[in-house]
């Protein structure tokens, strides 16, 4: 298969996919609006692309005009805007793979824009963390073109399966799961920071081991802190989409909304440097959650970064 592949978004997922696709000898190009800022972050992204042989494009249109498959991996709040920016420029019959964590309603709206311009929209739901699996991360696909896309992607070594030929099923699965996963992250951070403040964290951890003996709570807690410190903003935006999904079911999204707030607050702290310099190699990689909890507690105790209410 000699697909030309375009990436919209060059965050963690985009960079991982680019590296793996280039390793297979495929032509890859990318556009990320963050590069428009011309700052250290944009320079780092473009340097990464250059080192891996990824062609940097200056617009959505340039990516779409040169791609048989466009993989969209932006933040949740930009899902529809990214699809609309790409739609007029996609090649006829090109696949548009929407990896974004968005509600079924948002995915359906994006599909309308893509399909009416002659391309093929495929809803995708990434079902676990990407870094351990890379392009083999388990992925659910949905929509009228899901079966065609799944066959082609699996030939590239991806791990996809069709959830439904109807749009919304894959994303509903992902969004419902996120209530649990992102909610657990928020609960663990809030629970253990509270316990740490009161000096009872060891007792709480011991109780968790007794109740859920199959989980390494020390390791899991540190991993949750790491992921939220690094990706809290993205997770917060996803949880706002989850809240929309919950509302579509006729329920009040109390948990989804609270989780979004906790994730957003962690992102604010990270942006303010509470957890260290983002440019440092060790940022969000601390193996001991207690160190990050102490940083958080010190910040809020001095009224430096109290969450808004």
Which sequence ranges carry the predicted segments?
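NAD(P)+-binding Rossmann beta1-loop-alpha1 motif at the extreme N-terminus of oxidoreductases
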Residues: 1-65
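NAD(P)-dependent dehydrogenase/reductase Rossmann-like domain
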Residues: 266-309
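Rossmann-fold NAD(P) dinucleotide-binding segment
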Residues: 60-121
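Short, well-ordered alpha-helix to beta-strand connector turns
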Residues: 25, 66-67, 93, 137, ...
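Rossmann-fold dinucleotide-binding core
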Residues: 102, 107-182
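Helical "substrate-binding/catalytic lid" subdomain
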Residues: 173-279
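Conserved beta-strand segments of alpha/beta enzyme cores
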Residues: 27, 55, 95, 120, ...
């Amino acid at each position: 298969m000699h697909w030309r592949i375009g990436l919209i978004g060059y965050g963690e997922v985009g960079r991982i996919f680019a590296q793996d696709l280039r390793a297979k000898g495929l032509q890859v190009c990318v556009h990320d609006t963050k590069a428009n800022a011309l700052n250290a972050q944009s320079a780092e992204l473009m340097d990464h692309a250059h080192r891996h042989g990824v062609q940097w494009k200056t617009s959505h249109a340039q990516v779409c005009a040169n791609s048989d498959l466009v993989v969209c991996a932006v933040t949740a709040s930009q899902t529809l805007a990214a699809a609309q920016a790409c739609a007029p420029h996609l090649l006829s019959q090109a696949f548009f793979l929407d990896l974004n964590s968005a509600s079924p309603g948002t995915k359906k709206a994006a599909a309308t824009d893509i399909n009416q311009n002659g391309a093929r929209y495929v809803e995708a739901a990434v079902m676990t963390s990407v870094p351990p699996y890379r392009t083999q991360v388990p992925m659910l696909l949905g929509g009228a073109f899901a079966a065609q896309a799944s066959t082609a992607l699996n030939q590239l070594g991806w791990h996809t399966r069709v959830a439904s030929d109807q749009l919304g099923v894959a994303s509903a699965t992902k969004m419902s799961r996120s209530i649990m996963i992102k909610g657990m992250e928020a609960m663990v951070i809030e629970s253990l920071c509270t316990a740490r403040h009161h000096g009872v964290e060891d007792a709480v951890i011991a109780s968790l081991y007794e109740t859920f003996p199959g989980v390494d709570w020390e390791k899991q807690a540190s991993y949750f802190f790491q992921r939220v410190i690094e990706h809290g903003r993205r997770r917060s935006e996803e949880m706002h989409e989850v809240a929309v999904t919950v509302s579509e079911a006729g329920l009040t999204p109390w948990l989804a909304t609270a989780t979004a707030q906790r994730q957003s607050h962690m992102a604010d702290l990270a942006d303010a440097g509470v957890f260290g310099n983002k440019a440092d190699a060790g940022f969000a990689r601390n193996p001991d959650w207690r160190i990050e909890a102490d940083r958080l507690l010190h910040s809020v105790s001095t009224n430096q970064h109290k969450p808004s209410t």
